[in-house]
């Protein structure tokens, strides 16, 4: 697997170095990610060249915490005024590139020796290629790139060697207090740079802390309460569809009952008014019939009065005729008779 070039002495000791376990040291070491070999699986092609922009960024933002992007593209040097919190996740590139020295990058423990700290970071990887005939040192990702004519097997062998040698080199780097990019690393950066898992949240679920049991004896039995309470803890949840439906049904029932009571009261009042109207109608009819009967009686009395009046006039005429022809003796007799009969002037036949 690969050519037997004497310029790569690490390939001869490749199998034993891969089999022996990593050396354990007394100092604190950065944790090695178990999935890191899976991240280094590049396609069978030489790495792409990376050319940083020749012109630096323009004038910096006037404020320290100005508007800034969430995460810049991988390999792009950010401006000096940007600060990012630890634990930011960067997209995995297709090929290793130049890493900016303004903030620590996620590594697998492979650091440069102390002698190479004074050199410019990424100077050997500016063009993504090394000079022909020379082997490159370990990069920030622990990937070594050979010359343009180097094979993929040689790059893979240098990968394994750089990963196994990283444990012995990081102790020296921790003692000197400086890392590859000029920023001190500790074991905490390994924990900060770990990607946080995303927990899926259901749409209907409510995230919250379980509250205490809602009963009326809050604080009454604080010291004598047992570990497991018989009353289950009530959680702050949105009322489900069934509870909401029950509430809606109760409201609808109350509304229907109210409507029925209103209709019943309106019907009773309507019946009462109708009965009153019927009674008034009956009384009006009775009064009308009584009025008509009284009118009839009045007409009869008027007729009788007319008859009596005509009789009276005829009697007066007869009396005048009889008084003028009989002499004066008959008149006192009539007066006397009238006085004795109660003043009646009627003449007996």
Swiss-Prot record:
Biased composition (Basic and acidic residues): 261-277, 334-349
Region (Basic motif): 254-273
Key words of the record: Activator, DNA-binding, Nucleus, Transcription, Transcription regulation
Chief place of localization: nucleus
SUPFAM superfamilies (alphabetical): Leucine zipper domain (SSF57959)
Biased composition (Low complexity): 113-124
Location of region: Leucine-zipper: 280-315
Region (Disordered): 1-39, 101-196, 224-277, 312-349
Gene Ontology biological process: regulation of DNA-templated transcription
InterPro entries: bZIP (IPR004827), bZIP_plant_GBF1 (IPR045314), bZIP_sf (IPR046347), GBF-like (IPR044827), MFMR (IPR012900)
Name of one Pfam family that matches: MFMR
Function recorded in the entry: Binds to the hexamer motif 5'-ACGTCA-3' of histone gene promoters.
Record's protein name: Transcription factor HBP-1a
Organism name: Triticum aestivum
């Amino acid at each position: 697997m690969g050519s037997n070039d004497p310029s790569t002495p690490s390939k001869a000791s490749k199998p034993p170095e891969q089999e022996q376990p990593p050396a354990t040291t007394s100092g604190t070491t950065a944790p090695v990610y178990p999935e890191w070999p899976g991240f280094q699986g590049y396609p069978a092609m030489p790495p792409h060249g990376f050319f940083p922009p020749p012109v630096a960024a323009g004038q910096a933002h006037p404020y320290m915490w100005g508007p800034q992007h969430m995460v810049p593209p991988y390999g792009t040097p950010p401006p000096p005024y940007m600060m990012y919190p630890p634990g930011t996740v960067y997209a995995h590139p297709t090929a290793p590139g130049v890493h900016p020295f303004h903030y620590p990058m996620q590594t697998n423990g492979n650091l440069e020796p102390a002698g190479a700290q004074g050199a410019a970071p990424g100077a050997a990887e500016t063009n993504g290629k090394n000079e022909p005939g020379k082997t490159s040192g370990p990069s920030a990702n622990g990937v070594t790139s050979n010359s343009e004519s180097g094979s993929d097997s040689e790059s893979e062998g240098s990968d394994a060697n750089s990963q196994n040698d990283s444990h012995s080199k990081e102790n020296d780097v921790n003692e000197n207090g400086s890392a590859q990019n000029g920023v001190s690393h500790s074991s905490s950066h390994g924990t900060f740079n770990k990607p946080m898992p995303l927990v899926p949240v259901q749409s209907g679920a409510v995230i919250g802390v379980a509250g205490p049991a809602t009963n009326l004896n809050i604080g009454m039995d604080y010291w004598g309460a047992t570990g497991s309470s018989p009353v289950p803890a009530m959680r702050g949840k949105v009322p489900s569809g069934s509870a909401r439906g029950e509430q809606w049904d109760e409201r609808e029932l109350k509304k229907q009952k109210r409507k029925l009571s209103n209709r019943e009261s309106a019907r009773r009042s309507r019946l009462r008014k109708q009965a009153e109207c019927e009674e008034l109608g009956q009384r009006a009819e009775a009064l009308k019939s009584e009025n008509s009967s009284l009118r009839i009686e009045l007409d009869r009395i008027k007729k009788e009065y007319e008859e009596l009046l005509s009789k009276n006039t005829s009697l007066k005429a007869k009396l005048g005729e009889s008084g003028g022809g009989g002499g004066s003796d008959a008149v006192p007799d009539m007066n006397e008779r009238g006085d004795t009969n109660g003043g009646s002037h009627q003449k007996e036949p």
